[in-house]
Curated annotation (Swiss-Prot):
Gene3D superfamilies: 2.40.40.20. Is synthesized initially as an inactive proenzyme, which is activated by self-cleavage at a specific serine bond to produce a beta-subunit with a hydroxyl group at its C-terminus and an alpha-subunit with a pyruvoyl group at its N-terminus. Disulfide bonds: none annotated. GO terms for biological process: alanine biosynthetic process; pantothenate biosynthetic process. One of its GO terms (cellular component) is cytosol. SUPFAM superfamilies: ADC-like. It is found in: Cytoplasm. The modification Pyruvic acid (Ser) is found at S25. It comes from Bacteroides fragilis (strain ATCC 25285 / DSM 2151 / CCUG 4856 / JCM 11019 / LMG 10263 / NCTC 9343 / Onslow / VPI 2553 / EN-2). Keywords: Autocatalytic cleavage, Cytoplasm, Decarboxylase, Lyase, Pantothenate biosynthesis, Pyruvate, Schiff base, Zymogen. The active site is at S25 (schiff-base intermediate with substrate), Y58 (proton donor). The lineage of its organism: Bacteria, Pseudomonadati, Bacteroidota, Bacteroidia, Bacteroidales. Heterooctamer of four alpha and four beta subunits. This is Aspartate 1-decarboxylase. Its cofactor is pyruvate.
Length: 117
């Protein structure tokens, strides 16, 4: 049996922009993507800690080292700059494999969205 489990999580990143006039997605600093084991085009689930919104979109790679977390298109209506969001991706895997699987979870610096070691 296959089940869906948490694969990666960027916990408590700060939204830097909301761009309504860009075709959908979330732009994420490439350093954060690497640290969280996420890739461009990957489907993500986003929870906004400030307003309780939850929604899905896909990733666009942002400039490395920029700290950028930008919600684009319709998703821009769901957040405000400086909101704190949790960005999660999931993977399908065999039930037995899932029992021992450990997701990648990162906690970026809340002021800069830089990767904290």
């Amino acid at each position: 049996m296959m089940i869906e489990v948490l694969k990666s999580k960027i916990h408590c990143a700060r939204v830097t922009e909301a761009n309504l006039n860009y075709m959908g997605s979330i732009t994420i600093d490439e350093n954060l993507l690497d640290a969280a084991n996420m890739i461009a085009g990957e489907k993500v689930y986003i929870a906004d800690n400030n307003n309780g919104e939850r929604f899905e979109t896909y990733i666009i790679k942002g400039e490395r080292g920029s700290g950028k977390i930008c919600l684009n298109g319709a998703a821009a209506r769901k957040v405000q700059p400086d909101d704190i969001v949790i960005i999660m991706s999931y993977a399908l895997m065999d039930f037995e494999e899932a029992k021992s699987f450990k997701p990648t979870v990162i906690f970026p610096d809340p002021a800069t969205n830089s990767v904290v070691k």
